Design a protein with these regions (language model features):
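Conserved Walker A/P-loop ATP-binding site and its immediately adjacent core
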Residues: 86-107, 117-128, 233-237, 324-325
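A substrate-engagement module of RecA-like helicase motors
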Residues: 104-165, 171-175
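Walker A/P-loop
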Residues: 53-75, 204, 230
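Conserved interdomain linker/interface between the two RecA-like ATPase lobes of SF2 helicase motors
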Residues: 248-327
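Post-DEXD/H (motif II) to motif III coupling segment of the RecA-like Helicase ATP-binding lobe
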Residues: 186-195, 202-273
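N-terminal accessory nucleic-acid engagement/regulatory domains that precede
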Residues: 1-33
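Walker A/P-loop NTP-binding motif
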Residues: 68-83, 103, 215-218
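Conserved pre-motif I regulatory segment
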Residues: 26-60
Length: 328
């Protein structure tokens, strides 16, 4: 027995040294994921009110309302409470997955120390950002850091993508986990230990929705968490997805408001009507236009210096040009 316990400790130590296991950072609220000039919005301020328990969360809100940051902050909160170990972000297309990789790259180090950030789809090898992530960071001794080696190993096969800390993929990589294919248990293992975030849920067809329901049921069986994001969901589709976690509720109760957050646990259900919460807006400010004339319609040195000084003071500066050549 002592031998077995010692080997368990050795195994944990080896996993940490290899980069497969990364230390999580303490949850610091959704504001930690936002730029300094932004304040949490109406949807984002509800993160701390969401249950700290495994479950299915369906977030319906307009485009641009901050659903991505809300989902990532909630996943961070669950990871901090030992309810998950990693994050998987599944999107409908390769283009949206590539764009999400850039956003996750900016936030990965806020959730974990030396995280493995993996992109998985059929053309991930052509993504320049992902290639730079895989080859990043050498120590002063000229040896690759463990997390870089681990990232390269995980990226060798899409089936291993979910074994890291943060995975960004197309939705098919997740759906394969419930199909009768070789080594699907590897995907299932990675998904089960993660908070699965599925974006643009309304974009999937009937067949894909059937597979997605199977994925959600598998997550419920292992006590995992899922976050579904959509601008809007048809009532029938939303009810079928929510019912995968076992607790059935009145369909009208889940569709009586918009924007809306539905949370479904194994033995509990909660809903958060965003209309009942005041929208968090930045302080009002006034704008006073000041016309400045230039012979060639280009900013002179004095104007450029004013723009730089304003930016250094925290202002958001935008220069709009009439010609493409000038803008470039």
């Amino acid at each position: 027995r002592t031998y077995f316990q010692d080997r368990q400790q050795d195994a944990c130590r080896v996993l940490a040294l290899s980069g497969l296991v990364s230390n999580k950072r303490r949850y610091d609220g959704v504001h930690a994921l936002l730029d300094n000039c932004y304040q949490p919005r109406q949807l984002q301020v509800l993160v701390d009110a969401l249950p700290t328990a495994p479950g299915l969360t369906a977030i319906e809100a307009p485009t641009g309302s901050g659903k991505t940051e809300t989902a990532l902050a909630y996943a961070w909160k669950l990871i901090d409470q030992q309810l998950a170990e990693s994050v998987i972000f599944a999107l409908p297309t390769q283009a949206t997955a590539n764009a999400m990789l850039s956003r996750m790259e900016a936030n990965a180090s806020r959730l974990f120390t030396s995280p493995n950030l993996i992109l998985a789809h059929g053309n991930s090898r052509f993504n320049h950002l992902f290639q730079s992530i895989k080859s990043r960071a050498f120590t002063e001794q000229g040896q690759e850091e463990a997390w870089v080696q681990c990232c390269q190993w995980l990226s060798q096969s899409n089936k291993k993508v979910f074994l890291g800390q943060i995975g960004v993929c197309t939705i098919d990589q997740v759906l394969i986990s419930v199909l009768p294919v070789k080594h699907r248990f590897i995907r299932g293992l990675g998904i089960g230990r993660s908070v699965l975030i599925v974006d643009e849920v309304h974009a999937y067809d009937t067949y894909m929705n059937g597979l997605l329901e199977a994925v959600l049921k598998a997550q419920a069986d292992v006590g995992g968490s899922v976050i579904l994001l959509s601008a809007t969901l048809p009532m029938k589709q939303k009810q079928k997805l929510l019912d995968t976690y076992g607790l059935h509720t009145d369909p009208e109760e889940n569709n009586s408001a918009y924007p809306l957050i539905n949370w479904r646990g194994v033995n509990d259900a909660q809903r958060f009507d965003l209309l009942a919460h005041p929208e968090q807006l930045p302080p009002r400010f006034s704008i006073q236009p000041e016309p400045i004339y230039s012979a060639d319609m280009l900013p002179d040195l004095t104007m450029l210096e004013r723009m730089i000084a304003a930016a250094n003071a925290g202002a958001q500066v935008c220069l709009i040009c009439n010609l493409v050549d000038v803008a470039q």
